[in-house]
């Protein structure tokens, strides 16, 4: 039986709480353990790669950094309960890019959450940059440091750089997801072609994601601002990075390709770009109880 009170849904061994100001899920407790160390929120930007910086420096295209500051503003939030579970709907505007966003949640009695993210673009806006990704992001406590998935691997891979990454089942550590051999910090650690992806602690306790289509995900010890402070001159070596004690997770339906043609202005091929437009992503978040 689900209980709904004060923007919190609780059931047998779990609770989900929504932030009253943002409408985002701010707490997900499973068997008295908090799984979130930051809200589950929309994600449109990635830390700039060397190729991204090369494109930016040409000045030929709208600056993708506008998506780093594309903060959704809550317009309306509803939370109801019924036979099919508890349902929450949050509607937003995104003033920086002129878009509308809806986040819809269905919380079941087993603690699983079906999440739908839908963005509607303003077709009159011609000044909006391509997206870098379309999905959601959150943080967990650092004890959630084991990744297991069925998808492309074992190395990081992207839409236009995945030919040598074969589909299989892989078990890895969060500490090993980030590629430390790039000269400067940048986007790293994504795995694509995912059928399912889970993040757990050493006992196998945590969360799992799946979707009705292939998706991408990453879990690294660093936040995007640690890798990219918005400046093209921001150069620091990966060895200088200090983990902040949390695991930083991105899960997305799509992410822009890397390009890898050159690093002084060439965009990725058109089929790997994410032009401003309408996007949607539907996925399931479910608990993994492991040995607990």
Model-predicted regions and their roles:
Residues 1-292:
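Beta-strand/loop-rich accessory regions of lumenal/periplasmic or secreted enzymes
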């Amino acid at each position: 039986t689900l209980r709904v009170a004060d923007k919190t849904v609780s059931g047998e061994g779990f609770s989900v709480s929504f932030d009253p100001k943002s409408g985002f899920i701010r707490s997900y407790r499973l068997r008295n353990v908090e799984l979130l160390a930051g809200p589950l929120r929309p994600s449109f930007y990635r830390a700039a790669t060397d190729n991204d910086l090369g494109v930016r420096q040409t000045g030929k295209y709208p600056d993708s950094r506008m998506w780093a500051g594309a903060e959704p503003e809550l317009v309306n939030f509803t939370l109801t309960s019924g036979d099919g579970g508890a349902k929450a709907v949050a509607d937003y505007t995104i003033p920086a890019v002129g878009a509308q966003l809806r986040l819809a949640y269905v919380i079941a009695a087993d603690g699983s959450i079906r999440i739908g993210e839908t963005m509607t673009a303003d077709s009159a806006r011609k000044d909006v940059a391509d997206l870098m990704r379309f999905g959601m992001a959150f943080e967990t406590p650092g004890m959630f440091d084991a990744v297991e998935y069925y998808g492309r691997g074992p190395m990081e891979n992207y839409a236009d750089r995945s030919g040598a990454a074969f589909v299989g089942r892989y078990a890895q550590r969060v500490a090993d997801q980030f590629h430390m051999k790039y000269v400067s910090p940048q986007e790293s650690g994504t795995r694509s072609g995912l059928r399912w992806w889970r993040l757990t602690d050493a006992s196998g306790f945590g969360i799992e994601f799946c979707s009705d289509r292939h998706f991408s995900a990453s879990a690294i010890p660093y936040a995007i601002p640690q890798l990219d402070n918005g400046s093209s001159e921001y150069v620091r070596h990966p060895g200088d990075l200090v983990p902040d004690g949390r695991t930083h997770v991105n899960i997305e339906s799509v992410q822009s390709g890397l390009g890898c043609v050159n690093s002084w202005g060439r965009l990725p091929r058109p089929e790997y770009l994410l032009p401003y437009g309408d996007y949607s992503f539907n996925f399931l978040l479910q608990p993994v109880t492991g040995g607990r």
